[in-house]
Amino acid sequence: MTPQSQLTAAPPVVVIVDDDPAVRNSLQFSLELEGYAVRSYRNAAELLNAGELGPCNCYVIDQRMPGMSGMELIGQLRARRISTPAILIISQPNDVLSARAAQADIAIVEKPLLNNALVERIREACQHA
C-alpha cells in the first residue's frame, strides 16, 4: 500500500431497500458510478435479518414494499438506535406521510427519480452522517 492510497478515504456507504429489482439494480449502478459503496436489500425483513448492519452513511428506502412500509422500516431502525439519515422514495406522497416524514427528519424523493434529485439528497445526507 502506497502512502497516497493510505490517505484515500473509504467511499460513503449507501444502503438501498426496494422490492423492485429493476429499481434496486438501477440505483445501485448509478450510485456506484457516483463513487458510493452500495449494499442492497429486497425488503425490510431482509435488511433487519441481516445481522450486524455495519457502517452506513445513508439509507434509501422505498415506501411501498410488501410486509413493511418504508416508514415502518425506518421506525424499526430508530428503535434499534440507528440514527443514520434516511431518504424515502415514493410514487405519490400525501400530506399525512409528508408531515410524518418531515417530523422524523426523513427526506422524501418522489418517483420517477428525475435528474439528480436523489443523488443530491444522498450527498446532503452523507455530509450530515
Question: Positions of the model-derived regions?
Answer:
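Two-component/phosphorelay signaling modules centered on CheY-like receiver
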Residues: 21-39
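Acidic catalytic/metal-coordinating carboxylates
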Residues: 42-43, 69-72
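Non-catalytic signal-transmission and effector/linker regions of two-component phosphorelay proteins
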Residues: 1-15, 21-22, 114-129
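Hydrophobic/aromatic residues positioned on beta-strands within the core alpha/beta folds
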Residues: 89-91
